[in-house]
Amino acid sequence: MPATARAAVFFGPGKPFEIRDVPIPEVDPNGVLIRVTAANICGSDLHFWRGDAPLRLPEDGWIFGHEMTGRVAKLGSRIKTDSLGRPLKEGDRVAYTYFYPCGRCYACLNKEPAACPHKLERPLGPSTPPHLHGAFADHYYLRPGGALFAVPAELPDEVVAPVNCALAQVMYGLHVAGVRFGDRVVIQGAGGLGLQATAVAKDMAAAPVIVVDQIPGRLELAKAFGADHTLNLKDVPDRRERVKLVREWTGGVGADVACDFVGFPAVITEGIEMLRSGGTYLEIGTISRGAKIELEPSLLVWGSKKIVGVIQYDPWIIPRALDFLVRTKARWPWDRIISHKYPLEKINEAFAASEWHKKETTSITRAALIP
């Protein structure tokens, strides 16, 4: 076992990541050291990188990133199985959570770990034990209390890497929003989350599934993931016309569920207008604190509409996500979610290429770092 790991350390917006050597910690009896095999650049990572989700960073920087998969490098002495009780050994491929519900607050005691207000900590520097706090490194330390699950052999790392963030997040979000057989679903944003949400909604027998974006390549990919209709913002620049189209495509009713997977709050009011009376708006994309929207409350009252906010998920969703990938691997082109791969040393290039904000188009759906 090496004494150090390589990690990309972030020092703030506008500053390059620096590759540093970081101590590998002693593994707690209930902890697991994981050799990262793929770490994706998530949309929330771009928010932090660009600075529109400001954080107070430690002086020694921050190892961030969370959407990842890997192999067991070392098991704590008390860990013999994964979280479902299946035998686990060093070298096994695993999918795992990246947040740690406290287990003591009201939400946790009410069996709602995804709602735990303490599950995500402020950024910790690489000098703070256990040092390996994020995905953008060649090792990750799963602390005691984290959940991990063995990965089916037929799923490659590039397909598994989104499981613990994008796929689990959208599966849990659609579950919380109450999507039912035959529901009409609007998906705003055809990035990594939106594409996977399209496939999940179709698997839940939603019909029609309508995907809204402004990048033609992503909308074409949305069709490959089952979208019944796609709506290009540039082709239909008027908001009222877009809402009218959604009404037409849903038999004059509107969407049962509309979802924000974009991350810019300007889309929210439009999404709510696309809902039917009694519909539900699922807000996942906008994580930036301080963002504001103009919303007429009577839209909710007279329309009996609901807004549901979701961040992270209950860990039981991960094994279901893995099973879902196995079951649908011949149906949907999962290998196309990761469109670009970079070595860890080229993380600055990967982030610059992944940035789509204020660009007319982009060829990247999701970039993966391969340490």
Positions of predicted regions on the chain:
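Glycine-rich phosphate-binding loop and adjacent beta-alpha segment
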Residues: 206, 223, 228, 233, ...
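Conserved amphipathic alpha-helix within the SDR
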Residues: 240-251
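Glycine-rich beta-strand-centered segment in the early N-terminal region that forms part
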Residues: 25-39, 53-109, 152-154
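C-terminal hydrophobic helical "lid"/dimerization subdomain
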Residues: 1-3, 257, 269-273, 315-371
